[in-house]
Amino acid sequence: MHPLKVCALVGALALSSGISLGQGNAPQGAATAPVESPPPAERGRYLADIGNCVSCHTRAGGEPFAGGVPFQTPVGTLYSTNITPDPKTGIGSWQADDLRRAMHTGIAPDGSHLFPAFPYTSFTKVTDADVDYIYAYLRTLKPVSYTPPANGALFSVRWPMGLWNKMFFREGRLAADSKQSEEWNRGAYLVEGLGHCSACHTPRNLFLAEQPGNPYQGGRIQDSVAPDKVRPWFAVNLTSQKHGLGAWSVADLSKYFQTGVSLRAGTFGPMNEVIVNSLKRLTPADAHAMAVYVKSLQGPELTGEAVAAAQVASGAAIYKDRCEKCHGGSGRGGFFSGPPVAGSAVVQAEGPASLINIVLYGPTVPQGMKFGGWETMPSYADILNDDQVAAVSNFMRGSWGNRAAPVSAAQVAQQR
């Protein structure tokens, strides 16, 4: 499963409610590829890596980019397409302008609307030149004759997506901000465009379109917690507020993008594929540019219900027994013990799903991605009951200056 399952969910839920999903100026500060002008296909490979194309277009055990990844939704299953240059089952018959149209408008060569599991709502911001580089790269791939399984019946209905697009989609390339540095603009271009970070990290409205007034304030997604087991996750708030990335520095973010670990956190869950197949391949300059842009994001502080003192106290003993050895009595963790939970965006997230998942299932970490003396956290699903998981979660969400809404045993039960 992939973090972008949320985009398929957009299409599915909009269909179930009767509404489906369906050129500006190039930014001056957005260089189109790594320096030293490598051949177009090599530029395209790098850009496709930033877009993380391989994760959503490569099924388990399948050929790279041949599609077939299932996007499970409440109204059926949607499968990713074959984007190898096979002329019959892939996109071998596509021309460069066909890919531009698909990425910029969400329209296929035959005029049908694409589902936003393919995040054209973000890709519309990518320059024509960069799309052409990606096209050049895709043409070099091994053609694979493979037809993904048929989509669920409701996904055969595509025309209503045009209405959704008119309501919520704005086509156009990303314009540079003359008030910001070239590095900031480069970071904005990568985060907003190919990186499509908002697809997971921005909350959605009633029709499951991204809320333009609340960018990067966290979003609900669906992904695996264990083999063949999908549960909700909460993609953290990326703004520099206290409950977001306020405790992170630009250096922390840049290191995390390139290695999956930093003094603040290590990758786990839905971010694993994003790190391994995409961000880890960034040049140092681009990783730093993205970090500069992300660190500039602003949003309001949380003002809702907070964990009460009695709820905090109820989980203190569990934390001391099960968590303190690695995360410390101060919640600050350490290079030789574990990541901090004080100031953690995951711990303080508006939705507690990701925190609960870590406690229940442990954070699955990519092989070889270890920081300092951090040990792999065990699963507590068979050790702690729902009340205990809620209690220790509340202790962390209400201690060391953390502030977040309380977690209930019912919420824990939903994640099992």
Residue ranges of model-derived segments:
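C-terminal structural cap/anchor segments
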Residues: A316-N357, G373
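Flexible coil segments in periplasmic/lumen-exposed cytochrome c-class electron-transfer proteins
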Residues: N25-P39, I50, T58-L78, P109-A188, ...
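Bacterial N-terminal signal peptides
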Residues: C7-G18
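Extended, polar beta-sheet/loop recognition surfaces of beta-rich domains
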Residues: F257, A342-D387, A391
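Short Fe-S-cluster ligation motifs
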Residues: Y79-R100, D228-S240, S354-G373
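Positively charged n-region of N-terminal signal peptides that target proteins for export
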Residues: M1-V6
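Aromatic- and charge-enriched surface segment that lines or borders ligand/interaction sites
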Residues: I91-I107, G111, Y133, G246-V250
